Amino acid sequence: MKKRIVLNAFDMTCVSHQSAGTWRHPSSQAARYNDLEYWTNMAMELERGCFDCLFIADVVGVYDVYRGSAEMALRDADQVPVNDPFGAISAMAAVTEHVGFGVTAAITFEQPYLLARRLSTLDHLTKGRVAWNVVSSYLNSAALNIGMDQQLAHDERYEMADEYMEVMYKLWEGSWEDDAVKRDKKSGVFTDGSKVHPINHQGKYYKVPGFHICEPSPQRTPVIFQAGASGRGSKFAASNAEGMFILTTSVEQARQITTDIRNQAEAAGRSRDSIKIFMLLTVITGDSDEAAEAKYQEYLSYANPEGMLALYGGWTGIDFAKLDPDEPLQAMENDSLRTTLESLTHGENAKKWTVRDVIRERCIGGLGPVLVGGPQKVADELERWVDEGGVDGFNLAYAVTPGSVTDFIDYIVPELRKRGRAQDSYKPGSLRRKLIGTNDGRVESTHPAAQYRDAYVGKESVADRTQPSPFANAKAPVAE
């Protein structure tokens, strides 16, 4: 039986996400990112194509490394202005039934107690269709604007993330017992306080004495996504991730990354297939190879090279304006997206990219490769990435929105279905059940969150803290 390919749309609540300048194309609706109807239409379109998920990226800083300023990013709308990624999800869920929503939130800038509530709320309102893309943030501008002197070091951010996840799992999985919520109108008991427990967490970075203030949602813990395959990021993913987003420039490099991740997952006590791995890809297609190539050339005529260099400046922490455009890029240690620079300095056949290469090959597609072709050519390549590269699926970025998604659904999905690679209907249940296959929609028993199930049963509860009251048995007055 052929392996089904997981299909996620990769988007962001901004104008220019991965392709700089193409918002100017006549068919682009990218400038409607503030319009709720844009997002609800997108969700319905994805469900028409039986996509697994809308993966929503986010940043809370700006791209101000290139030429020492955010001016170019603002001029080209390169991930700025950008809205909160949570805002449109409930509306999208209201017009769909199955497609999932992977929302990005950085652990560096929000307390776990608050973020746990936001994610549980969405999991309730979507009936269990939420994933959380865990990131540690990489833009120094974001750190400065929340009052930090500078961005935390790369590995320290992952140390924080380890403890952050521990707090989240305690809140989601442990603080409420399964039968804590009674909803008993006759007795007047909505929640049995003896079955709700403070987590009493006190660690190096976080202190959370209380209990989760949301009742358990359909999945309790949302599906955990993680982006980044640096050494420390891979270790974090091997323990926590159920879906992992990787950047790669070749099938060979993808095979190395996916094999390493699965080896680490196995070493962490999880199965090798417990993590679904998605790679970034932009597909430009039509009814033939020639039509797709013509479309690609048209899109390139709208691309903005300096806009892409502004994005790459933020992604790598390097001001490309200061580099010789024809000199190979050099690997370096900094606190930006390490895998971005690694993908450019350790590429296929040891190729090292130049600034001119980035301009020529990445103005469309951004952080990932671009695949141009008709249905058969594209399907062949997708199968090769899956069968030889070891990925489970793709985060599909757009060149022009919503046209790139519609073209993929109209041209590529039917071809993949002919080959037994794409679903033509959805399984019932939560996103986790659809994507991972767990029967009850809860995290697998080998996942670190599972250790907190029933962990507080028999321990201190909210009821234990209740003081005597003379009004405990009082009745409401009856109007005469």
Curated annotation (Swiss-Prot):
It catalyses: dimethyl sulfide + NADH + O2 + H(+) = methanethiol + formaldehyde + NAD(+) + H2O. The keyword Oxidoreductase applies. DmoB has not been identified yet. Only a peptide from the protein encoded by a putative flavin reductase (AC E0XCR3) was obtained by mass spectrometry, which is insufficient for linking this gene to DmoB. It is an enzyme of class 1 (oxidoreductase). FMN binds at D58, T104, H154, Y158, S230. This is Dimethyl-sulfide monooxygenase. The lineage of its organism: Bacteria, Pseudomonadati, Pseudomonadota, Alphaproteobacteria, Hyphomicrobiales. Keywords: Flavoprotein, FMN, Monooxygenase, NAD, Oxidoreductase.
